[in-house]
Amino acid sequence: MSTTLAAPAKLKSLLLNLHTHCIGLHVNDVTPKVYFKLLIRHLLQISRSNAAHPKLRRRAQILLVSLFLSGVTLFSGVTYSTFKIILKCYKFYKFPWKRRNRRPLIRRTRSQMQLDSGARIMYIPEVELVDRQSPDDNKFMNATDKKKRKRIFIPPKDNDVYEHDKFLFKNVELERAKNSQLFYSKFLNQMNVLSKILIPTVFDKNFLLLTAQIFFLVMRTWLSLFVAKLDGQIVKNIIAGRGRSFLWDLGCWFLIAVPASYTNSAIKLLQRKLSLNFRVNLTRYIHDMYLDKRLTFYKLIFDAKASNSVIKNIDNSITNDVAKFCDATCSVFANIAKPVIDLIFFSVYLRDNLGTVGVAGIFVNYFITGFILRKYTPPLGKLAGERSASDGDYYNYHLNMINNSEEIAFYQGTAVERTKVKELYDVLMEKMLLVDKVKFGYNMLEDYVLKYTWSGLGYVFASIPIVMSTLATGINSEEKNMKEFIVNKRLMLSLADAGSRLMHSIKDISQLTGYTNRIFTLLSVLHRVHSLNFNYGAVPSILSIRTEDASRNSNLLPTTDNSQDAIRGTIQRNFNGIRLENIDVIIPSVRASEGIKLINKLTFQIPLHIDPITSKSNSIQDLSKANDIKLPFLQGSGSSLLILGPNGCGKSSIQRIIAEIWPVYNKNGLLSIPSENNIFFIPQKPYFSRGGTLRDQIIYPMSSDEFFDRGFRDKELVQILVEVKLDYLLKRGVGLTYLDAIADWKDLLSGGEKQRVNFARIMFHKPLYVVLDEATNAISVDMEDYLFNLLKRYRFNFISISQRPTLIKYHEMLLEIGENRDGKWQLQAVGTDEAITSIDNEIEELERKLERVKGWEDERTKLREKLEII
């Protein structure tokens, strides 16, 4: 019993003696309530007093800093935990109790909201609904957890920013030609431009995160310096056998571990958070140009650098390369900032111990080894870029196989695809192995220099002050020498570690250079294509030669703005119809107007009833009465035009010009089109958005949020499906409505059903003008007849592109493109002698083919007999 009572008394006596001998504070009669205030007041008094013993004052300062950091850590943790508890209690009160004994709420479908300023608010689910299996009856039931949604504010797009940044990217290469190569760094100039995207202003959140990271880096360096001193003091007390001092230092060790651990975790968290924020800024910047109304994502294929791996595998560039660039940027910053801060702090402290000569010798060693490593550093940036390009090729080929799996299966192309995939995989493995092989020799040299050479020299520099002091005084104090050696050794190791990480960062910078160049190339191309003066990849040298020849013939000076000379056609928007006048249909290429010409001087217009003309005509009829409200097309006359011709003659190219995704090269060419809301295009290949509902497919390109915001209802879509004979789709699913069903509609629907969905889109959007390209080639004859009559019944103005003469009966005008691919064409009204003659010629051609059927069958029989003999 006495032993049990003696233990607390001994512990109390030990604590009282620690306060008395270590910091000179007597706490015998102090109550716990006033203990903390008394301790802080006493420590502040000692740390400020010049009369106090230096050792006592140093201990007081260490305790104050440790208590402050521990208090900050504890306060932040308690505050965050309290906030979370209050938030949980509020949600528990607001939702479960309020909704008890009520019917379950309808699932929220709205994902974003457009503000008047152009900004958007998006709601992103954080926790997905999962299915849980009941342990009692093996029945699946939906989880009761509701989806947590995070509110994200997306600022409106500022086109002025992109117009300004376009010149920044353009001037980088121009500055390289102006400046001397000695003072020019391609990497630094590219990073300088990209940094304006990553951190737009000093008031940006990323700048605050960067400042916080620098603060914690400095804090970690100071803590490392303090731990080094404390380590030497602990070793000294152990050798001297001072038990009380050892216990006191050990308590300080455990106390300082709290802010040190918090600092290390905070640095990692801030680095990851900063990388994600950089990725958000860069991705939004890319998306604003890539997914713009100027159709940058399509026009990229015509840029001069379209064959570059960055643009050819642009999906890999936007996803993987951006992520790698942001991670590498934050990693390199941390790997450079921390060693630099360490070098400054440790050098200042070591200067007092080693002297100026010792610190100078350390830095001379750093510069020599840095020069050696820099000289033998392999081109890791170039190799990283090549590896990323090979990775993109391999990924895209697999993606192409997924998108065309059915076609490959029909062709039995497994062997060919396997060979190609194996070849791309071997190339990828070769690139990855090449990087590892190149790193092998460099890593061996790096380890020898940084780990062993620097450690050996560290022992030499750490022992210099001890040896010199012993020789000078003739006194050998083992305790003092041991403490100084431990402190100097630990600081030297930390300094060597800082230097080695600084040398390691040379390799990281080399890899970052490759990622930076790829991202900069991507943004440069996007800016060029996004520009209003994009010339579709026309090469200036070809244009200048052509311009000089033309100027020489006309005795004029050549113009210098070649980009403006490439595309010289005129586009008139918000026109009450579709008009093409004297337009040369030319495939976009580096030769611009000197490229492959498909159709010469194409001229037509709907919905005006014009006289039959041919390609020999210079212009269409006078449009001075275009504003007359009595004209048929202003009242929805249902004018129609059929563009007829063989494969490869340029029919679909006409649609591309009307949609403004192909340019008008010739100077006297005029394109007049209605506003975007009054024209609708149906391409050859029906498109279905991935992961969307049936409602999303019908209303495309309108979003579901806009659909409900504008007051539309599902019953209108049901009526449209009835009109296009697709109402049976609604009976496939079970539940409230099949319109909410999510499926891979591209594979679920047949070819004819997908084309009828296109007509459903026309019925929903109700445009004044529709351009259809082979929109019924997968539909039966009776359904085709019904759909075209549906367009005529609702008085749509439409242009059909086809190679089947059977569609002539549904149109008023016929534009026939020659079969000889000489660029000739003929426009005529259906029912005229020319149109009837054209139809008769088609019928005669079909009859001649039918007469040869018997001969073809005989040839097939003979071939089968020969094959049986073989």
Swiss-Prot record:
Pfam annotation, one family: ABC_membrane_2
Residue intervals passing through the bilayer: 60-80, 207-227, 247-267, 330-350, 353-373, 455-475
Highest taxon above the source species: Eukaryota
Single GO biological process annotation from the record: fatty acid beta-oxidation
Domain ABC transporter residue range list: 608-866
A cellular component annotation (GO) from this entry: peroxisome
Boundaries of every ABC transmembrane type-1 domain copy: 210-501
Binding site for ATP: 645-652
Alphabetically ordered keywords of this record: ATP-binding, Glycoprotein, Membrane, Nucleotide-binding, Peroxisome, Transmembrane, Transmembrane helix, Transport
GO molecular function terms noted in the UniProt entry: ABC-type transporter activity; ATP binding; ATP hydrolysis activity; ATPase-coupled transmembrane transporter activity; long-chain fatty acid transmembrane transporter activity
SMART domains: AAA
InterPro entries found in the cross-reference section: AAA+_ATPase, ABC1_TM_dom, ABC1_TM_sf, ABC_transporter-like_ATP-bd, ABC_transporter-like_CS, ABC_transporter_sub-D, FA_transporter, P-loop_NTPase
Glycosylation sites: 142, 281, 403
Record membrane topology: Multi-pass membrane protein
Compartmental location: Peroxisome membrane
Function: Involved in the import of activated long-chain fatty acids from the cytosol to the peroxisomal matrix.
Subunit text: Forms a heterodimer with PXA2.
Membership in a protein family: Belongs to the ABC transporter superfamily. ABCD family. Peroxisomal fatty acyl CoA transporter (TC 3.A.1.203) subfamily.
Protein name: Peroxisomal long-chain fatty acid import protein 2
Gene that encodes it: PXA1
